[in-house]
Amino acid sequence: GVSSRARRPPGSSRSSRRGVTSELAWTTHPETGWEEVSGYDEAMNPIRTYQVCNVREANQNNWLRTKFIQRQDVQRVYVELKFTVRDCNSIPNIPGSCKETFNLFYYESDTDSASANSPFWMENPYIKVDTIAPDESFSKLESGRVNTKVRSFGPLSKNGFYLAFQDLGACMSLISVRAFYKKCSNTIAGFAIFPETLTGAEPTSLVIAPGTCIPNAVEVSVPLKLYCNGDGEWMVPVGACTCAAGYEPAMKDTQCQACGPGTFKSKQGEGPCSPCPPNSRTTAGAATVCICRSGFFRADADPADSACTSVPSAPRSVISNVNETSLVLEWSEPQDAGGRDDLLYNVICKKCSVERRLCSRCDDNVEFVPRQLGLTGLTERRIYISKVMAHPQYTFEIQAVNGISSKSPYPPHFASVNITTNQAAPSAVPTMHLHSSTGNSMTLSWTPPERPNGIILDYEIKYSEKQGQGDGIANTVTSQKNSVRLDGLKANARYMVQVRARTVAGYGRYSLPTEFQTTAEDGSTSKTFQELPLIVGSATAGLLFVIVVVIIAIVCFRKGMVTEQLLSSPLGRKQRNSTDPEYTEKLQQYVTPGMKVYIDPFTYEDPNEAVREFAKEIDISCVKIEEVIGAGEFGEVCRGRLKLPGRREIFVAIKTLKVGYTERQRRDFLSEASIMGQFDHPNIIHLEGVVTKSRPVMIITEFMENCALDSFLRLNDGQFTVIQLVGMLRGIAAGMKYLSEMNYVHRDLAARNILVNSNLVCKVSDFGLSRFLEDDPADPTYTSSLGGKIPIRWTAPEAIAYRKFTSASDVWSYGIVMWEVMSYGERPYWDMSNQDVINAVEQDYRLPPPMDCPTALHQLMLDCWVRDRNLRPKFAQIVNTLDKLIRNAASLKVIASVQSGVSQPLLDRTVPDYTTFTTVGDWLDAIKMGRYKENFVNAGFASFDLVAQMTAEDLLRIGVTLAGHQKKILSSIQDMRLQMNQTLPVQV
């Protein structure tokens, strides 16, 4: 029978005599040779056969040719022959010319053009396939045994072919001839469909069959292809598909069927669909995520397979303990945490009128311990509050929030407590001044206490003469004013003076002792006092001389150390062993007296040598890992403690190298430590050391409590003053100035790579993309040979186009960081694609100023984004500019507006036209402040005319307490007023 991989070409007649009972009429030559006869097969079925038995005559050359067989696309043909052969020894009285073999030939032709005499009956034009010999021959006619042989030939190129059989003197019968070819049947493998494919021209040929993903599947590796071998079998699969998100495998991985109701699949893959997590549902088939039910939400960081959760209920059992102008609040956790474990608390302080009808947020003088930073919240259920004023009425709201509170349209649940502070003594007098002095008196004044905590009744002044080993007898006087005249003093004498204020609560603390001196009797000061400037000047000059000498000694010493360091490194050894003048000249440029030079750890033949040279080895017994706080490229990031001998225990961040690492991964992991270990600056993350002599391998750095700058700003939207933000930017610029002076290019400067500690100090981190910058005055760039990804939104155009990374490209990135900081962590270029960003920057589009951004800061951003990198400011200039802005705070009050020109706004981000909204609620939804819709309605602000007249006090009164939200709503109200003025009718 015919196998599943073997069939005749479509539309052609099978070249077979098996089972044929009608006359075949094949061509014979000569006519006395092959003879067509009827016979029976093994099952005694009637068949037509060809036989020949001219064994008694020598020089036989009998040919038999089939009819024309269409080839179509087949390149190699297989022929199965069934035949019987008579044993020559069993035939009596025959000459030695008797044969027991015959020859198989084929002839290719584009048309059925063969005739009785054409082509010539000979090898060439006929092509010989093989000489066919039987496995068994028979000696008696009735016991003939059928032989089966299969031969193949190719490659074929014409439209068809003939088969021919040559007899040279055998006694045989040709029972069956079957021509066929082999193919690989269509199949599904790896969720891809591969079509039916014919085998190649040779038995060893491999034919490539391209595949396509089955419906609802996606490619996971390309190209998709299978190889069909010469036996018609598939082999060597390349590439694969997998079921798309929302679909699962079915029918033995031959189909991808949609997830049913109540199930979902968030990622592509071969896994099955999963039931919806609690509090969620699907609305259609093929769901990739289950939608949260009403009142339940997911945080942005929650995975799609996590349960939907709700906001927590209000804290319970608030207890207050008031002590004069400070208090302690304690409370119990909410009855319902909302199904989450990231519960936090916000304490809102409000100062109220006597009737508590009008409350406003407390000013910044009120201190909280632990300190509250915007929306980061408290984890402890206890807070100490100090520096509140005496007597006023206060209301404290303790809000319970969790990771999805920002998703809820309603304000957090809270418990409130009303507090009336007690009378407290005044604070200390900060400073005192000498107004005039005579031989027996002096007139003093002072600044009133910063916190009087009530009406000041009078001041008590204590003074005593300063003598050799101590002070004399103290005298006290009182004054109703913040000034006093002290009489009865000695001439040319020094006195120590202190002052304190008194209220009905009693005296406050004395001020710090301050020294004042009376004049001589003749009105002149003493000789010692007159010579004081000369003495001070001489001492200062002497001190400066000593400092200069010490600095010169240090410079010379460091110069020798740097030179020795360079010469002992692989870079230096290369210099000593090289006669290349260009190399020597470059190295000399690095060795600048008094300047520390960065050395690329990748120049070391042994990377471990760089680690030993620049990083301190720490014993594992000194390290204690407390919790995992994240995951990095090489392993986990943990928080822990470090206790070195002779030093106090400190919190540290610990990067660990995952198990099963390769030597290259270990080298790349430790290279960051080799880089960080060379830096020593308050705005660069500090390396404590490494652990390489035990497992796991660790890099230990200082711990930054507030983590990455971008997420920190988003959590504290609108909570900082402009001066605070500029201070952060100044710290980042100072760190980058330090790196650029060491000829070091960061290449990945972004807010996500700036870490913030508890004191809001920003430090540059993440040196994974950084590389050494060669100091070549002609072209001070590092040409990257890496093919890795680069952060398009933060990278300078020349670095994207030509992989030219310089300190100037870092300046471009710093401008983007400025924009991130002033926009409180907004994504640069918003939702534009990377290619759109590249095109826009190429067309001189630049980011517009963030909301409420000072003009001076946005201009500095634009300076950083100048196309010509040589015209961008240096980091030293940026630091100087920011210092001037900090000293002249008034310059930061001029707010930037979007202007046209070369550096025009990237996108039209104007506030929506309020006339397009039918209700105030629609307007609040448009500006993403829909959570306050109920507040506006309950307070009576139901029309745009009323909303346009609202002030910050109105927002506070109706419950909009977050400063960032107040600023956003007021900004939109201001635009609403402008639109109303533009649409007023004009009287003619």
From Swiss-Prot:
It is a single-pass type I membrane protein. Residues 623-886 form the Protein kinase domain. The keyword Transmembrane applies. The active site is at 748 (proton acceptor). Its EC number is 2.7.10.1. A motif (PDZ-binding) lies at residues 986-988. It is found in: Cell membrane; Cell projection, Dendrite. Glycans are attached at residues 323, 418. ATP binds at residues 629-637, 655. Keywords: ATP-binding, Cell membrane, Cell projection, Developmental protein, Disulfide bond, Glycoprotein, Kinase, Membrane, Neurogenesis, Nucleotide-binding, Phosphoprotein, Receptor, Repeat, Transferase, Transmembrane, Transmembrane helix, Tyrosine-protein kinase. Residues 915-979 form the SAM domain. Present in 10-day embryonic brain and body tissues. Prominent expression in kidney. Lower expression in lung, and barely detectable in brain, liver, heart, skeletal muscle and thymus. This is Ephrin type-B receptor 3. It comes from Gallus gallus (Chicken).
